[in-house]
Design a protein with these regions (language model features):
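Short, low-complexity, intrinsically disordered N-terminal peptides in bacterial proteins
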Residues: 1, 428-433
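Generic low-polarity alpha-helical segments
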Residues: 13-15, 27, 82-86, 117-119, ...
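Long, intrinsically disordered low-complexity tandem-repeat segments
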Residues: 403-430
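Acidic, glycine-rich flexible loop/linker segments
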Residues: 2-145, 155
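Conserved alpha/beta-domain cores
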Residues: 105-401, 432-433
Length: 433
């Protein structure tokens, strides 16, 4: 099953079963976790045996345009040497194969009716790639980075740093600021950067934490992470203040182009307590990530409490509304991005946010963009880098085709006018018959 698609029909490469970063290889792994970050971002494709379409590492692959194919666990052991990943057939062939012609797929979405796009990125490379698109996607006015992805890019271990004491927390915050500055440097005039505060589930944290124990949880998805973890972590405010201070030190007023959003939060009480915990004054912008049913129904209260903007995280929201683990392939058919209950939740969040005068951004997979735009009262979307690139390239191809058609029509019109005037290339037109 294809978990993350690609414009290409097939990908060839040597199998990488060791998890080390090997550029252009096909990464083969039982499942995808943060410990494989460096290997994932340089891979040509990924083959795994577990996981769903919208897991965290799958989202990273979607951002980078790296295809991900899931195969049966029993088949994983046979994948060695050179292989060809056939996305059109949802299979892996041993050895090299003749590249298949590109199969026609659904037309990429159009952004004609979209006013704003917040692009989900993994590091400065993604920002640079989007801003280098030609023609430029004018609707792109912001970029969104998860703190945990910034950590992975900067090779930081947040739990180790935060639990080493106040000094370690401050060093961690300063290092994060350095990473964000690299992204700031890639922004175009009028663009900004939003960082979603740390939302590291215990199972993922255990993979990248070496110096302190990470308590296991029976259900990490519903465990201690997001806003509830931020409230419980006594050293996080020190890191956050160091981050903001270092940004101001490095870029001065341009630090105002960076804002922050709270992940995995339920209600106004959590929001107000977290603002106090972080030492944020009333005038400091702080957004909210709406990704639980409770948060959907608290949207209006978030606005009253001063949330600067709302980001609707459909990937988590869908799994909670439909009780379908987004990382479990056995319930993949139940995980429906267009389910009526999901659309009703999205519509409620957007309407309540707009009623409170707060911008609302809705995350959409590329295949869902037009569906959401037609059915939701929003023109603000969040999209992954690679999917936005496909949309932009398709728009450029359409524009070129329209120009060519216009030029042909103009040429035919001129020729027709000449015929009507009785002259073609300066000679009289012979009468027919």
């Amino acid at each position: 099953m294809v978990l993350v698609g690609s414009p290409t029909t097939s990908v060839q490469g040597e199998c990488n079963r060791g998890g080390e970063p090997i550029p252009g290889a096909v990464l083969v792994a039982e499942s995808l976790g943060p410990e494989l970050y460096e290997a994932i971002v340089v891979s040509a494709a990924v083959v795994c045996a577990r996981g769903g379409r919208t897991g965290h590492m799958q989202s990273l692959c979607r951002s980078r345009g790296i295809p991900v194919l899931r195969v049966a666990p029993a088949e994983l052991g046979s994948l060695v040497g050179e292989v060809t990943v056939r996305l059109d057939r949802e299979s892996v062939l041993l050895g090299a194969a003749v590249p298949a012609p590109r199969a026609p797929g659904p037309a990429p979405a159009r952004l004609d009716e979209v006013d704003s796009v917040c692009v989900v990125v993994a590091d400065a490379t993604d920002v640079r790639a989007v801003n280098a698109l030609s023609p430029r996607v004018a609707q792109v006015d912001s970029y969104f980075i998860r703190e945990e992805f910034a950590c992975l890019s900067a090779e930081l271990s947040p739990f180790d740093a935060l639990r080493s004491g106040v000094a370690g927390a401050r060093r961690y915050g300063a290092a994060l600021a350095d990473e964000l500055c690299g992204m700031l440097a890639e922004l175009l005039p009028g663009q900004r950067l939003v960082m979603r505060l740390l939302d590291l589930r215990s199972d993922d944290a255990a993979q990248i934490t070496t110096g302190v124990p990470v308590e296991g949880e029976p259900n990490p998805e519903l465990g201690l992470h997001g806003a509830r973890w931020l409230l419980a972590e006594e050293n996080y405010p020190h890191a956050f203040r160091a981050l903001r201070g270092r940004l101001r030190e490095l870029v001065g007023p341009a630090a105002d182009r960076v804002s922050f959003a709270v992940p995995f939060i339920n209600d106004r009480d959590e929001f107000e307590r977290l603002r106090a915990h972080l030492g944020l004054g009333a005038g400091t912008p702080l957004g909210v990530f709406v990704e639980t049913p409770a948060a959907v129904h608290s949207t209006a209260e978030f606005c009253v409490a001063g949330a600067s903007e709302l980001f609707v995280g459909t990937k988590d929201l869908i799994q909670f509304y439909l009780a379908a683990d987004r990382g479990n392939h056995l319930v993949a058919a139940t995980y429906q991005t267009r389910h009526p209950a999901v659309l009703a939740a999205l519509r409620h969040a957007v309407t309540a946010g707009r009623g409170g005068g707060v911008p609302v951004h809705v995350f959409a997979l590329g295949a869902d963009v037009e569906h959401y735009v037609r059915r939701l009262p929003t023109r603000r979307l969040m999209m992954c880098t690679a999917e936005l690139r496909q949309v932009a390239l398709a728009a450029a191809e359409r524009a070129a085709a329209e120009r060519a058609a216009g030029e042909r029509a103009a040429g035919e019109r001129v020729a027709g006018e000449r015929v009507a005037a009785g002259q073609v290339a300066g000679e009289p037109v012979a009468a027919a018959g």
